[in-house]
């Protein structure tokens, strides 16, 4: 059986930056998980004493706080600045971009449509920078019964599929006088999604490695599953089952943007140990 890695996979720029920052700072607390990968979070806690707190209210005697890659709300940032604590911002620059756009567009009188998952921490943070009105949607149908203003700005969660974002944009163009469109989908997301699409079309089994609470990993899995019925989403090599690979000729592997290489290599090693001819 051939084992092939996607052309683009794994750690993105924002995650690499955050991990490096956490390792250098040490002895700190992150507000929410730094990234969406439980194994890497455990490694940071064990080796660098970087612990994860649920929220700002959980801070007690910590001296250093790290803002997660997904960012935090504007209100939480203001609250954090009032505390006697050193702040290190690990928000991905691709996430900071829609925050800044929302703040500026609001000042100019635009209401904002955010294409994304309302419960995702990134989207919560972005929405908090809108001072007019924000509409968070996952589908154009959610906009059909809303009385839209004359001026709308549109941004996207960084991990969404571009074609779905364009469905929202095309709907708004037909419904309102002025639409300002900002492409806030991360370039790494484009590349990883294109790569897994290409690989899944020629594989008869796919393994996607990443946190099951990771939006970009789940998106990769959905693309793989669309093209390759026998696709599996795992967090560690412990979840692999030999029967997945029996009678298979081509195994494709990809990984989410928060998945470190050391986990991916463990997955590959275990698949090889199954000794599938």
From Swiss-Prot:
Disulfide bonds: none annotated. It is an enzyme of class 1 (oxidoreductase). (2E)-4-hydroxy-3-methylbut-2-enyl diphosphate binds at residues 36, 70, 120, 158, 214, 216, 258. GO terms for molecular function: 4 iron, 4 sulfur cluster binding; 4-hydroxy-3-methylbut-2-enyl diphosphate reductase activity; metal ion binding. Pathway: Isoprenoid biosynthesis; dimethylallyl diphosphate biosynthesis; dimethylallyl diphosphate from (2E)-4-hydroxy-3-methylbutenyl diphosphate: step 1/1; Isoprenoid biosynthesis; isopentenyl diphosphate biosynthesis via DXP pathway; isopentenyl diphosphate from 1-deoxy-D-xylulose 5-phosphate: step 6/6. The active site is at residue 122. Its cofactor is [4Fe-4S] cluster. Dimethylallyl diphosphate binds at residues 36, 70, 120, 214, 216, 258. GO terms for biological process: dimethylallyl diphosphate biosynthetic process; isopentenyl diphosphate biosynthetic process, methylerythritol 4-phosphate pathway; terpenoid biosynthetic process. Keywords: 4Fe-4S, Iron, Iron-sulfur, Isoprene biosynthesis, Metal-binding, Oxidoreductase. Isopentenyl diphosphate binds at residues 36, 70, 120, 214, 216, 258. Its EC number is 1.17.7.4. [4Fe-4S] cluster binds at residues 12, 92, 186. Binds 1 [4Fe-4S] cluster per subunit. It catalyses: isopentenyl diphosphate + 2 oxidized [2Fe-2S]-[ferredoxin] + H2O = (2E)-4-hydroxy-3-methylbut-2-enyl diphosphate + 2 reduced [2Fe-2S]-[ferredoxin] + 2 H(+); dimethylallyl diphosphate + 2 oxidized [2Fe-2S]-[ferredoxin] + H2O = (2E)-4-hydroxy-3-methylbut-2-enyl diphosphate + 2 reduced [2Fe-2S]-[ferredoxin] + 2 H(+). Belongs to the IspH family. Catalyzes the conversion of 1-hydroxy-2-methyl-2-(E)-butenyl 4-diphosphate (HMBPP) into a mixture of isopentenyl diphosphate (IPP) and dimethylallyl diphosphate (DMAPP). Acts in the terminal step of the DOXP/MEP pathway for isoprenoid precursor biosynthesis. HAMAP family: IspH. This is 4-hydroxy-3-methylbut-2-enyl diphosphate reductase. The gene is ispH.
